């Protein structure tokens, strides 16, 4: 591959277009500040890139983008399929402003059977590694955990971490409630446990009929040998499998249905685009999810463009099903790229009959329903913003971004400040920030608030002064009373800020719906009715800020207490403390360890093991 770069200062677009090759590749458009605007791929770079500057029939989104282009970069590839993969990598890495982006692009969760001697069944998200077995991907974490609960009931596989498994001396509660066979203490042989693992894998691969026949044979054999307790266990497994099968709308008994199928339904309505994904794994419907790309720069979105972007971003570089059923066509180049990664031929189906037609119709109905719900949600959010604007004496168009701050600690210990963001009519978790408070005295909430506000907005001011692109909030919400708001006003004066401030205090009754609002620049202190849309918006953002602060505080506090618990033991320094935590998987594992187990850790003598054990018990 070959890449061509030119600096914005000397860049001549007409000259650049004249010298472009008629080869496949990827192009990037940049604005005056060097920010990437758009990434695209082409079979013929010269024809594709030149078309942006020679045609006048662009969509509003593309037309707005072209006006801002000041610099272009290209990368030549060997084929259109290779260009498509590279384009997708650039889009994920750069998040260009005018590309179609499906923002929920985290790695999807899997159900994992580990490669341990006694395999662990676990929720997993990340890079797939040998020798573990992975089943999925699943649309969300709940779908994985539901499957784990099902498998626990039927196959009773362990879910504990290896560090816990290796140091147990008695069965845990899961054994008592018949959700685990307690391999940790030898209540099941390795051979029998691995047989259960194979059965679970067979079930997850959709071979339920084969598994049922195997269990029926084992039940009959056990009964013939007068092993009635074992026969009853197999009977219970068969009954549980029957219940699971009856709860699925996918017919896993149909031999024409491959194990892994994805259904994709596209819907477009009133400027919104939705792609509804249904995941069928092992012949079972394991979940579904609706995806909404950002269309704010595209008032007349082309559904096919968005559908193709979803397929590329959702599947390239990730696990793929054997078959994709969709209500839109997938381009040949994209099919080629997907099959090249998959290592075998895939089926792409748009014309359906029979039960597949029913499945796709259900997915389309879900996509339409999701769009309807999104419209209602947006209307509700806009109503809340309109009401807040009236209270603050602002134009509702001037309120897009709210930032809210809260302080959390336990009697001054492990103080954390949180900043949560509400933007584009929704909370934005990826933009949340936590701040470790370092200069304030323990328990001094006012000083902590001063520190976090000064750090955050002082840094934004500095970045803006250096010519960087920054986002200022339209309103800042402070979770606290007059004291905290007074601190915020002081910081505003020091930094020269004029952003509207709103304080939200619990009020004397400390009940939801009875909050007091403080507007420091008008001197107003008042309550809104419990059913006020503006109050509901402020409560939502305030509650999220409180949750984010307290979870961060607890993590910091617990980590400090673990360090303190071991650090107080004579003879245990940082290296030995880390060795103990690594060996036993955390403080609980260290506490559960016997004296003999402690001695096995490098650097821990018999005498020191005795000291550690006595200190923790």
UniProtKB/Swiss-Prot annotation:
Residues 209-244 form the UVR domain. The keyword DNA damage applies. SUPFAM superfamilies: C-terminal UvrC-binding domain of UvrB, GIY-YIG endonuclease, RuvA domain 2-like. Gene3D superfamilies: 5' to 3' exonuclease, C-terminal subdomain, GIY-YIG endonuclease, UVR domain, UvrC, RNAse H endonuclease domain. It is found in: Cytoplasm. GO terms for cellular component: cytoplasm; excinuclease repair complex. Residues 22-100 form the GIY-YIG domain. Its main location: cytoplasm. Interacts with UvrB in an incision complex. The UvrABC repair system catalyzes the recognition and processing of DNA lesions. UvrC both incises the 5' and 3' sides of the lesion. The N-terminal half is responsible for the 3' incision and the C-terminal half is responsible for the 5' incision. Belongs to the UvrC family. This is UvrABC system protein C. It comes from Neisseria gonorrhoeae (strain ATCC 700825 / FA 1090). The lineage of its organism: Bacteria, Pseudomonadati, Pseudomonadota, Betaproteobacteria, Neisseriales.
């Amino acid at each position: 591959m070959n890449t061509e770069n030119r600096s914005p200062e000397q860049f001549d677009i007409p000259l650049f277009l004249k010298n472009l090759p008629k080869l496949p590749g990827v192009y990037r458009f940049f604005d005056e500040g060097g920010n990437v605007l758009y990434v695209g791929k082409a079979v013929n770079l010269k024809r594709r890139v030149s078309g942006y500057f020679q045609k006048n029939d662009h969509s509003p989104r593309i037309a707005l983008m072209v006006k801002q282009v000041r610099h272009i970069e290209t990368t030549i590839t060997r084929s259109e399929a290779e260009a498509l993969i590279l384009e997708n990598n650039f889009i994920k890495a750069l998040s260009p402003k005018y590309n179609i982006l499906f923002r929920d692009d985290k790695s999807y969760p899997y159900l994992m059977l580990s490669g341990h001697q006694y395999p662990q069944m676990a929720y997993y998200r990340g890079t797939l590694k040998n020798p573990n077995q992975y089943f999925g991907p699943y649309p969300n974490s709940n779908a994985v955990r539901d499957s784990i609960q099902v498998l626990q009931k039927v196959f009773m596989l362990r879910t504990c971490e290896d560090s816990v498994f290796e140091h147990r001396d008695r069965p845990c509660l899961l054994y008592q409630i018949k959700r685990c066979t307690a391999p940790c203490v030898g209540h099941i042989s390795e051979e029998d446990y691995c047989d259960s693992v194979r059965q679970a894998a067979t079930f997850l691969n959709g071979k339920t009929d084969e598994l049922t026949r195997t269990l029926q044979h084992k039940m009959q054999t056990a009964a013939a040998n007068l092993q009635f307790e074992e026969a009853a266990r197999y009977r219970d497994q068969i009954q549980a499998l029957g219940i699971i099968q009856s709860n699925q709308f996918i017919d896993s008994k149909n031999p024409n249905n491959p194990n892994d199928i994805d259904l994709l339904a596209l819907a477009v309505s009133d400027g919104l685009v939705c792609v509804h994904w249904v995941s069928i794994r092992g012949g079972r419907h394991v979940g579904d999810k609706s995806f909404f790309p950002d269309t704010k720069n595209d008032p007349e979105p082309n559904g096919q463009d968005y559908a193709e972007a979803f397929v590329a971003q959702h599947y390239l570089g990730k696990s793929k099903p054997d078959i994709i059923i969709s209500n839109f066509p997938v381009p040949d180049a994209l099919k080629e790229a997907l099959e090249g990664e998959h290592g075998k031929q895939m089926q792409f189906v748009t014309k359906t009959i029979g039960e597949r037609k029913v499945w796709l119709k259900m997915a389309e109905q879900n996509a339409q329903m999701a769009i309807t719900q999104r419209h209602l949600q947006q209307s509700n959010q806009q109503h809340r913003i309109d009401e807040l604007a009236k209270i603050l004496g602002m134009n509702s168009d001037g309120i897009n971004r709210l930032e809210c701050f809260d302080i959390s600690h336990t009697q001054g210990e492990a103080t954390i400040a949180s900043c949560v963001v509400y933007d584009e009519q929704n909370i934005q978790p990826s933009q949340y920030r936590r701040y470790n408070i370092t200069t304030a005295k323990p328990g001094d909430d006012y000083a902590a608030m001063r520190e976090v506000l000064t750090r955050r907005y002082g840094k934004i001011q500095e970045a803006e002064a250096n010519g960087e692109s920054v986002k200022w909030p339209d309103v800042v919400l402070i979770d606290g009373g007059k004291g905290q708001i007074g601190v915020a006003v002081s910081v505003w004066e020091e930094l020269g800020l004029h952003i509207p401030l709103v304080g939200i205090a619990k009020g004397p009754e400390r009940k939801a719906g009875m909050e007091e609002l403080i507007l420091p620049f008008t001197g107003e202190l008042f309550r809104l009715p419990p059913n006020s849309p503006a109050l509901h918006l402020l409560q939502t953002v305030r509650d999220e800020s409180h949750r984010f602060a307290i979870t961060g505080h607890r993590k910091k506090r617990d980590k400090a207490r673990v360090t303190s618990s071991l650090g107080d033991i004579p003879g245990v320094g940082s290296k030995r403390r880390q060795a103990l935590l690594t060996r036993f998987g955390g403080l609980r594992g260290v506490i559960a360890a016997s004296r003999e187990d402690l001695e096995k850790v490098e650097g821990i003598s018999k005498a020191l093991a005795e000291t550690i054990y006595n200190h923790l018990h």
